[in-house]
């Protein structure tokens, strides 16, 4: 049995970790290096860090922070945000990232996925998809969930995996920050189309949500931010609960 993963996520803007709901209303939470250190010690299986600053100055500051984060943790690190070219892959991998997450950059230039997979290997390329229901269809959104691309999300995700994405991080905009459980309907739809690991993101509110999530076929990891940042649930407590309930975890 493959062990399931618990992954905290840090959204970094102007050098600080921030958190919003349904991709809106961003609030300052903490220092990223301090937080990364805390999650590493708390038993997180991986850490995801997103650069949500679009400016050039912000990017330089983020690169500096990323290098510090990578030197402080001993778990796999996935980095995303502003990844538009192979040079961007180089930049974050040199900082110490293990995997690189592509989103809007790949929607703009789909060839980025096969090019990156060829250069770094599929295991290094994570497709991050921000998905929302529009007129009964799962649509993929760009620009941090602000722009409807009009594309069918399931077709886009399947294409990306066929062309080299080794993992999918599915962010449901509909359940993001709402803490009412993961978007299982959306996750099942994606799992029926791809066979690579899927990370579920958006909606975690309590430990039972993770237990329900891992009862669904094809879901390898649960990603959350708010509930961990605000210490409503510790990773240790969550993993012990899941383990006790028959979910294979690395304790």
Q: What spans do the regions from the language model cover?
A:
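Charged helix-capping and loop-helix junction motifs
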Residues: 60-67, 110, 150-154, 180-188
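Conserved anion-binding
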Residues: 12-14, 18-19, 97-170, 174-175
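Catalytic cores of alpha/beta
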Residues: 73, 77-96, 185-221
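Glycine/small-residue-rich loop that forms an oxyanion/phosphate-binding "nest" at active or ligand-binding sites
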Residues: 53, 61-120
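Conserved, mostly hydrophobic/aromatic
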Residues: 11, 39, 47, 79, ...
